[in-house]
Amino acid sequence: MSEAMMWLLVRGVWETLAMTFVSGFFGFVIGLPVGVLLYVTRPGQIMENARLYRSLSAVVNIFRSIPFIILLVWMIPFTRIIVGTSIGLQAAIVPLTVGAAPFIARMVENALLEIPAGLIEASRAMGATPLQIVRKILLPEALPGLVNAATITLITLVGYSAMGGAVGAGGLGQIGYQYGYIGYNATVMNTVLVLLVVLVYLIQLSGDRIVRAVTHK
């Protein structure tokens, strides 16, 4: 493997990490409040609102059901409006964020559902407001589950970013497709696969350690 290809792979790793973590961050900025809203508006919860819950849940389910490669192509016009181009690192972050947000929202809701109902009832009995319950009870108690959700999301985004590489998003996916598949270079393809596996392993390892650190003893 040439030195130029090695540097290209290094840049591909950096671009993949950038796409993964930046879109993961923005996905959580959108998905976390949506997930909390899904939870608190569920039947029997602190801000029960059946109409809002059904509407929000339907939107989340619709976007979750769209395969990422189709979402990527469908969002090309919107991506051009937002970042001015439909290819490259910045362009990839837009559909990655949109793909991640509903996934995160549902996992946040599920993490909150694991909290014992007695804690919430005790807080309500002491006169806590819904906002106080969310800030001081729900989010702290669900922190291990939220960290686990973040880990799963980042791993999913690594795979999404690789798919995006096939349509010019950059990163390891584009290198594997352009130089490995199109260029019939098995060495490059295998190297890309190994690098993706290593990235996923490191993200999972880091996530597991953080979960252990924040889990109540």
Swiss-Prot record:
Highest taxon above the source species: Bacteria
Membrane topology note: Multi-pass membrane protein
Keywords of the record: Amino-acid transport, Cell inner membrane, Cell membrane, Membrane, Transmembrane, Transmembrane helix, Transport
Cytoplasmic topological domain: 41-54, 114-151, 207-217
CC per GO annotation: plasma membrane
Domain ABC transmembrane type-1: 13-204
Membrane-crossing residue ranges in chain numbering: 20-40, 55-77, 93-113, 152-172, 186-206
Compartment(s) where it occurs, according to its Swiss-Prot or TrEMBL record: Cell inner membrane
SUPFAM superfamilies the UniProt entry points to: MetI-like
Regions of this protein lying in the Periplasmic compartment: 1-19, 78-92, 173-185
A GO BP annotation: D-methionine transmembrane transport
Coiled-coil portions: none
A Pfam short name: BPD_transp_1
Task performed by this protein: Part of the binding-protein-dependent transport system for D-methionine and the toxic methionine analog alpha-methyl-methionine. Probably responsible for the translocation of the substrate across the membrane.
Annotated family: Belongs to the binding-protein-dependent transport system permease family. CysTW subfamily.
Protein name: D-methionine transport system permease protein MetI
